[in-house]
Amino acid sequence: MLRTLSLVLFTLVSVSALAQGGPPYYTNDPGTPGPFNWEINIGYMPFFYSNQSVSHTPDVDINFGVGERLQLTYENAWLRVQNPGSKTEFGLGQSNPGVKWRFYDGGESGLSVSVFPQFFLNNPNDAVRRGITPPSQSFLLPFEFSKKFGPVDVDYEIGYQAVHKGPDGWITGLVLGHEFTKKFELDMETYLPGTFHPAQFQPTIDFGGRYKIHSPVILLFMAGRALEPTRSNQTYFLGYFGLQFLLPPKSYNRE
């Protein structure tokens, strides 16, 4: 039932979706920091499977605004990987550089659309040999859509992933959110990554929010799980718990 609901939601908003995407969620939105502004997200991200646990301790996501509509991004994480019967491994994850361009901007409540090409690259260390990162490297080409419908912010993302030494895949995600006050918002996300050959996908659902502690610091939190019955490659718990820093502070409105 939950999987059916998530697929229906994707269908309804794929034709319409600056909204609630980005950390702590997997789905991105068309928003950018603005010229010469920084958005830095630092978080703890646990992924618990029936036969393994992987944690980003921490995950660091750095974004820099180049003009009003362009953003440069770099993300990486220090990973903790625990497999039953073996010692815990630590190491650097894949580097994730990217460029986001919001090529259509409908204003605060109108439709906005962006493209966000990204690479996922292994670093020159032994993380692949130790099973910390996958041997495959990839290029992701997603498009993001956002629009406000009354009190609800809608963000939708869909993309194609070309994989070297692995099956090509796709991603799609939806975030629905509402700002209850100027400082506090709550959101729901459904996220669906998959591969073409073999035809597989792993839908997840999560709930989270943001709380503006003090400009320019924002608390980020999210928790969720897989929608399908737990298998060895399905997460029975996933989360994000961290902080967002908007710099320089004078560039953002104080509330």
Residue ranges of predicted features:
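Positively charged n-region of N-terminal signal peptides that target proteins for export
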Residues: 1-4
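N-terminal signal peptide c-region/cleavage motif recognized by signal peptidases
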Residues: 14-16
